[in-house]
Amino acid sequence: MVAGCSDTVSVNAPPLTGADARACRALLRALPDSVADQARRPVADEDGFAAAWGDPPIVLRCGVPRPAGLDRFATCQVVNGVGWFIPESQSQGDPVDITMTTVGRAQNVQVSLPSDYFPPANAMVDLAPALERTIREIRPCV
């Protein structure tokens, strides 16, 4: 998914069209310059639906498929109005690499957070305003 090449981060983001592409472009324009106290980095992504911060990179991909394990029994966390799913194996309290995905939004947004930036709450707080403004909530996280 991610490979560093000098200052540019290579990301495989999904190809999107229509409303999904418009919402994800709006999100990328609204994203902050820093996440978890890490500066934004340039991204090599053909379709333009990804962003990155820091080294090792925190990587955001917009318009991803629903993650495996996210079902009606999965737990989610709400931080500043945005619901997040983190696989149970990654949410035991130990610093591990985390892949967290928004819950209940019209487009799924996935953030890969290296263990260097554990716990994930700082990144969730930093990303919440842009997500709230641009990616429509269709179902609350419960």
Regions found by a protein language model. Name each.
Residues N12-V64:
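N-terminal secretory signal peptides
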Residues C5-V9:
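Bacterial signal peptide processing site
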